[in-house]
Amino acid sequence: MEWWTAFQAFILGVVEGLTEFLPISSTGHQIIVADLIGFGGERAKAFNIIIQLAAILAVVWEFRGKIFQVVRDLPSQRQAQRFTANLLIAFFPAVVLGVLFADLIHEWLFNPITVALALVVGGVVMLWAERRKHVIHAEHVDDMTWKDALKIGCAQCLAMVPGTSRSGATIIGGLLFGLSRKAATEFSFFLAMPTMVGAAVYSGYKYRDLFRPEDLPVFAVGFVTSFVFAMLAVRALLKFIGNHSYAAFAWYRIAFGLLILATWQFHLIDWSTAGEM
């Protein structure tokens, strides 16, 4: 493994880990950064599956206590049964739309201009949602109804557009639908588990021929890096939301999106081949 390839794997692992669970779009950042450092082609598709799986395993580890409690109580406790049902209900819309439109979206929308526009629009919506007066009816994830779960699941489908952000769509959706900031964030993390594992399994099977033994060192660098930085990001976000709003992330999205559009408009960076991941 050449040092440059290892460096690319490290950088993309850091980007995936830091951005997957922040409301700033990991896919959008991956498209932009991968293009800037020249990491693309067939191997990149397999690599992305690996680092996304690492990120979700970091969340599973971080919430292992809650997961164990739910699994233990599922046969007999109504609260655990309702929580599990809500996750399945929220997961369902993404499954349906993902199977129907994933390839089409990847072909037509995976490019930096779409990412930039989605970042800006999402940032504006996030600012509006944060400044809007909230009527909270679900302080904790266990207070959610199946209707809350379904609405958040539908909001998650917006994240199929790169640059939107899966966590951003579900968290802001949760706030708009009456969840507290803590409940919306935690449910977003839990919903990420079946959603991302399902996506990884589907993509892994689809691109199974792209996994080659000679790429294992590259995958290992990306996996470890993504896992570590995802865990750090999740812990930091859970502490951050205790005393802060999501406005800082919204302004970052807007600034980053406008920067991408400016580099495209003034031909400072050639984005013509970007998104081929």
Curated annotation (Swiss-Prot):
The keyword Flavoprotein does not apply. It is found in: Cell inner membrane. GO terms for cellular component: plasma membrane. The chain crosses the membrane at residues 47-67, 85-105, 108-128, 183-203, 218-238, 249-269. InterPro entries: UppP. Its EC number is 3.6.1.27. The keyword Transmembrane helix applies. GO terms for molecular function: undecaprenyl-diphosphatase activity. Keywords: Antibiotic resistance, Cell inner membrane, Cell membrane, Cell shape, Cell wall biogenesis/degradation, Hydrolase, Membrane, Peptidoglycan synthesis, Transmembrane, Transmembrane helix. It is a multi-pass membrane protein. GO terms for biological process: cell wall organization; peptidoglycan biosynthetic process; regulation of cell shape; response to antibiotic. It catalyses: di-trans,octa-cis-undecaprenyl diphosphate + H2O = di-trans,octa-cis-undecaprenyl phosphate + phosphate + H(+). Pfam families: BacA (PF02673). Belongs to the UppP family. Bacitracin is thought to be involved in the inhibition of peptidoglycan synthesis by sequestering undecaprenyl diphosphate, thereby reducing the pool of lipid carrier available. Catalyzes the dephosphorylation of undecaprenyl diphosphate (UPP). Confers resistance to bacitracin. This is Undecaprenyl-diphosphatase. It comes from Pseudomonas aeruginosa (strain LESB58).
